[in-house]
Amino acid sequence: MLTLSTIDMLLAINEGQLIEEVIITLLASPQLAVFFEKHPRLKKALLKDIYQWKKSLQEKVKETLVPTIIADEFALYQQTQSLCNAVFNQQVDNILTELNQLDSSFVIEATQLIKTNKPFSPAQQALFIQRWRISLIFQVTTLHKALFEQEQEQLLAELQERLALSGSLSNTFSENERAAGRLWDMSKGVITKTPYDEKIIQRYSDFLNQQPELHKLASLLGRSKTAKSLPEESVIFESITIVEKAPDTTPEQVNGIGLSDDILRLLPAELALLGINEVEYEFYRKLIEKQLNTYRLQGDSWQERTVLRPVTHHLDEERPRGPFIICIDTSGSMGGFNEQCAKAFGLALMKIALADNRACHVMLFSTEMIHYQLSSSDGLQELVKFLNQTFRGGTDLASCLNEVADKLNTPTWKDADAVVISDFVAQRLPENLINKIKKVQQQQHNRFHAVTLSNYGKPSIMKIFDHIWRFDTGLKSRLLRRWRQ
């Protein structure tokens, strides 16, 4: 069967220009114009999808089959093209009959051309073929427009849904252009959307804004750049310049008697030889041979000298910002206000992850573990599920940390920061687990953060963490924070 893409090529139809017109028409729609004015950051993210739209339309053209009537007419057109002038004049009436049978739009014009020009000269035959080609191009272009209008309506409907969702959440997630782009990408994964989904995200976003200290704490943790020091003895010798005292010829004091030709420092006995005629020539011989007895004067000077010595280096490398693994305690003691704080803190870290293009994985732990990948293509759906999760059950912190340690040994998460949000009222950790975590910290330099929502966390548990961030959720602290606001 003949496809639209094939007939475009055979008729030399500019398929790319037709697709370009569809995209321009789509972007000029009033709905998009209003949205772009309101959310300029999301506009840039949306425009990045243009290439994918074009590619999708091209694939659709390749897959769409030409109707049988047009395909048969095109086959007849190709046969007629190859006829010589004499044969064409013999078969032109049969060609007209077949065009009538195919109900071709070219029939009326073909009939007029035959009446006017029969028998056809070679030039008139070429005109007939050319007019027929124009008729076929018009029919195929009409097919394109019908197909593209249908695709445009579907694409616009999808865009309107994504725009509505992204627009409602832009104040929550569009911290920068990268975050806006990630939000736009995730909106594609939302197949079904209800007002309740947006409402719960907005509710926790509002709660986070009402707790500026919690928001600041999340920002400090998420943006922290802890340096890792790797002391290492260097086997390389480095050159250094030292200043030392060394003998010099600068005349400072008499240091003895020597042989030279320095007349200014002659001993009186040598000078006496010059006044005796018999030994005058002996004086000149000693002068030439530098054998005259003279005073030796010498001083000290400070001189620079380069020496080599071994040096010990301490390499301080800035810790790269890796993904987040957020572990949230969902035990019964974490209910109520603690639950709100934990979920809002997770939302804040997700916002930072989107802005910094980092992965964000949430693990809820109590007697069982539930995983949510908040930075995936369906991250918004995962976020809604996470925020709807209820907190109940016991606290199995050991199983959670064991799974985190295993996850940090995988290539995807080897540079991740582990964040545990809990009241840390739990059982003691096994010694083998503590050693396992220390090994990960020492060998891979992963950071373990503890966000404690209570003042009653066990010190034996807290000591395994690199950083401890405290946010007291007690009634007294809550009232003090509200009073400060």
Curated annotation (Swiss-Prot):
Keywords: Chaperone, Cytoplasm. It is found in: Cytoplasm. Signal peptide: none annotated. Gene3D superfamilies: von Willebrand factor, type A domain. SUPFAM superfamilies: vWA-like (SSF53300). It holds the Pfam family VWA_CoxE. One of its GO terms (cellular component) is cytosol. Its main location: cytoplasm. InterPro entries: Uncharacterised_CoxE, Uncharacterised_ViaA, VWF_A, vWFA_dom_sf. Belongs to the ViaA family. Homodimer. Interacts with RavA. Component of the RavA-ViaA chaperone complex, which may act on the membrane to optimize the function of some of the respiratory chains. ViaA stimulates the ATPase activity of RavA. NCBIfam families: PRK10997.1. This is Regulatory protein ViaA.
